[in-house]
């Protein structure tokens, strides 16, 4: 508009159409690292001691499931793992006892205390799995049980008058026992792990590894890893859950070298070079359970108990349970389980059907 000339309506309208300049978005400030030594002691590091004291006072839950054909030493291995009779003895099994016609779920609870810390351990056994002539869909009762524990936890979680500490019966770890054939995995092995790895942390183990030579064991481990990779089966610890480079480096070594753990279990002690050791007596000598030159039991124990126990619990809660919870609430219109949109009762999420395996 020319200087000195009155502003017209057109000029005014055009000026209204011109957008005002947008303010620049605020740049988020990077967190500053402050050396507390300059300010005096604060006490942040005491949180670790606070957590330790609370854990010692309340204890913690750990629920482990064992799955595999009968005769693979599942009960013996779990007893060896926790150095307690936490599962029924293999020696107490009656040879005349009938094999269950269907898969059964048996949970046994124990309290183990070590160094002032109490662990409320539950061992879930699955007698009858894989022992039938027709093993079609024999994993469904196991998946149903796992989902039922998620359902129990969810109902307590959304309860208005919920308990201060919700009882945790969710399965944190599933040890899947592979028969030491030295050849390849059975279709049932592949179908079980492919299906159940989506709902629980599966750790594959080769049972009774002392029946194979070192060369046979190494080749079988490589073959199992290859078959799992080809079939798109991810076992714990899954790559996608690695939180940082340190986790990735540590877990890659486990995934590429240790898995599946070739183990031997025994609750019997023998004298070897003046020391009492857990082992199995064979015509060729004593197989020492905790000797890494003999088997990988010590690696499995360290992995499950000493380095990854807390992570097993966290992945169960943050990944598997949250997946179930989101699906359950989504199917229920966002309402608590048990109530539909019009007050109708909804059934629990059923086991997902999967391909036939014999």
UniProtKB/Swiss-Prot annotation:
Keyword flag Transport: no
Superkingdom, natural source: Eukaryota
Signal peptide extent: none
Domain Septin-type G: 58-331
GO biological process terms on file: cytoskeleton-dependent cytokinesis; protein localization
Family: Belongs to the TRAFAC class TrmE-Era-EngA-EngB-Septin-like GTPase superfamily. Septin GTPase family.
Post-translational modification comment from the UniProt entry: Phosphorylated by PKG on serine residues. Phosphorylated by PKG on Ser-91.
GO cellular component: cell division site; microtubule cytoskeleton; presynapse; septin complex; septin ring
Matching InterPro entries: G_SEPTIN_dom, P-loop_NTPase, Septin, Septin3
Location relative to the cell: Cytoplasm; Cytoplasm, Cytoskeleton; Synapse
Induction note: Up-regulated during neuronal differentiation.
The encoding gene: SEPTIN3
Keywords, alphabetical: Cell cycle, Cell division, Cytoplasm, Cytoskeleton, GTP-binding, Nucleotide-binding, Phosphoprotein, Synapse
Subunit structure: Septins polymerize into heterooligomeric protein complexes that form filaments, and can associate with cellular membranes, actin filaments and microtubules. GTPase activity is required for filament formation.
Protein residues bound to GTP: 68-75, 102, 208-216, 265, 280
Ranges where the record places region Disordered: 1-30
Ranges where the record places region G3 motif: 125-128
Phosphoserine: residues bearing it: 91
Region G4 motif, annotated ranges: 207-210
Upper taxonomic lineage: Eukaryota, Metazoa, Chordata, Craniata, Vertebrata
Xref: SUPFAM superfamilies: P-loop containing nucleoside triphosphate hydrolases
Function: Filament-forming cytoskeletal GTPase. May play a role in cytokinesis (Potential).
GO molecular function, a single term: GTPase activity
Pfam family, one: Septin
Name the UniProt record assigns to this protein: Neuronal-specific septin-3
Summary of the tissues where the protein is detected: Brain-specific.
Residues covered by region (G1 motif): 68-75
Gene3D superfamilies in the record: P-loop containing nucleotide triphosphate hydrolases
């Amino acid at each position: 508009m020319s200087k000195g000339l009155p502003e017209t309506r057109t000029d005014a309208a055009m000026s209204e159409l011109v957008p005002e300049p947008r303010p620049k978005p605020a740049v988020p400030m990077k967190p500053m690292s402050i050396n507390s030594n300059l300010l005096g002691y604060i006490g942040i590091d005491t949180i670790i001691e606070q957590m330790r004291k609370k854990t010692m006072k309340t204890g913690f839950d750990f629920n482990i499931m064992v799955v595999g054909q009968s005769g693979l030493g599942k009960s013996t291995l779990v007893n060896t793992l926790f150095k307690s009779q936490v599962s029924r003895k293999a020696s107490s099994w009656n040879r005349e006892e009938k094999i269950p016609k269907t898969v059964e779920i048996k949970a046994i609870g124990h309290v183990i205390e070590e160094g002032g810390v109490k662990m409320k351990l539950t061992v879930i056994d699955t007698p009858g799995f894989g022992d039938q002539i027709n093993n079609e869909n024999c994993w469904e009762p196991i998946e149903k049980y796992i989902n039922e524990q998620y359902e129990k936890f969810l109902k307590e979680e959304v309860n208005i008058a919920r308990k201060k500490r919700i009882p945790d019966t969710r399965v944190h770890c599933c040890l899947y026992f592979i028969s030491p054939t030295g050849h390849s995995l059975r279709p049932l092995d592949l179908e079980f792990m492919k299906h159940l790895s989506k709902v629980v942390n599966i750790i594959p183990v080769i049972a009774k590894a002392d029946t194979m030579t070192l060369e046979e064991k190494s080749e079988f481990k490589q073959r199992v890893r290859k078959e799992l990779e080809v079939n798109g089966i991810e076992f714990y610890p899954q790559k996608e859950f690695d939180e940082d480079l340190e986790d990735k480096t540590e877990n890659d070594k486990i995934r590429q070298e240790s898995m599946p753990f070739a183990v031997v279990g025994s609750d019997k002690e023998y004298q070897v070079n003046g020391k009492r050791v857990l082992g199995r007596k064979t015509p060729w000598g004593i197989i020492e359970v905790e000797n890494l030159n003999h088997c990988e039991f010590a690696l499995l124990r360290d992995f499950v108990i000493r380095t990854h126990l807390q992570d097993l619990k966290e992945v169960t809660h943050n990944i598997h349970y949250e997946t179930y919870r989101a699906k359950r609430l989504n199917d229920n219109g966002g309402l608590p389980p048990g109530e539909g949109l019009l007050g109708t009762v909804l059934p629990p999420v059923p086991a997902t059907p999967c391909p036939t395996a014999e």
